[in-house]
């Protein structure tokens, strides 16, 4: 139990996949729990994680996080975890069914957006149902972003 004077940080983001919003068109987001070992949680609490190259996949009616990197916890000894192991995601049956049908039918992908700790101290992941952008879509969104920046600069200078 935490000491009386300590304040717990709510929704502390541990890892974020920044390129996801550039490379994919986000259709819908879901909050999923993570099945982790003790050393993985300690490594996450230190703020060490990388989900930039990871994705989620459906296997046997369950959703698994693949290719995420949680480095070994340095104070752990032989009971340490494997850094790139597959991790099970906890979602409701209805959500799993909805995600499976969207991925199979419409050719969408499941990508993690961020890992954070909720107000109860549980590790959670924001999972996105997304569709990959083509090169011209990426260029278009970049032009739009640049134009919005220019507009705000002009309004700031003139206003």
From Swiss-Prot:
<comment type="function">
    <text>Required for rescue of stalled ribosomes mediated by trans-translation. Binds to transfer-messenger RNA (tmRNA), required for stable association of tmRNA with ribosomes. tmRNA and SmpB together mimic tRNA shape, replacing the anticodon stem-loop with SmpB. tmRNA is encoded by the ssrA gene; the 2 termini fold to resemble tRNA(Ala) and it encodes a 'tag peptide', a short internal open reading frame. During trans-translation Ala-aminoacylated tmRNA acts like a tRNA, entering the A-site of stalled ribosomes, displacing the stalled mRNA.</text>
</comment>
<feature type="region of interest" description="Disordered">
    <location>
        <begin position="131"/>
        <end position="159"/>
    </location>
</feature>
<dbReference type="InterPro" id="IPR000037">
    <property type="entry name" value="SsrA-bd_prot"/>
</dbReference>
<dbReference type="Pfam" id="PF01668">
    <property type="entry name" value="SmpB"/>
</dbReference>
<dbReference type="GO" id="GO:0005829">
    <property type="term" value="C:cytosol"/>
</dbReference>
<dbReference type="InterPro" id="IPR023620">
    <property type="entry name" value="SmpB"/>
</dbReference>
<dbReference type="GO" id="GO:0070929">
    <property type="term" value="P:trans-translation"/>
</dbReference>
<dbReference type="InterPro" id="IPR020081">
    <property type="entry name" value="SsrA-bd_prot_CS"/>
</dbReference>
<feature type="compositionally biased region" description="Basic and acidic residues">
    <location>
        <begin position="137"/>
        <end position="159"/>
    </location>
</feature>
<comment type="similarity">
    <text>Belongs to the SmpB family.</text>
</comment>
<dbReference type="GO" id="GO:0003723">
    <property type="term" value="F:RNA binding"/>
</dbReference>
<keyword id="KW-0694">RNA-binding</keyword>
<protein>
    <recommendedName>
        <fullName>SsrA-binding protein</fullName>
    </recommendedName>
</protein>
<keyword id="KW-0963">Cytoplasm</keyword>
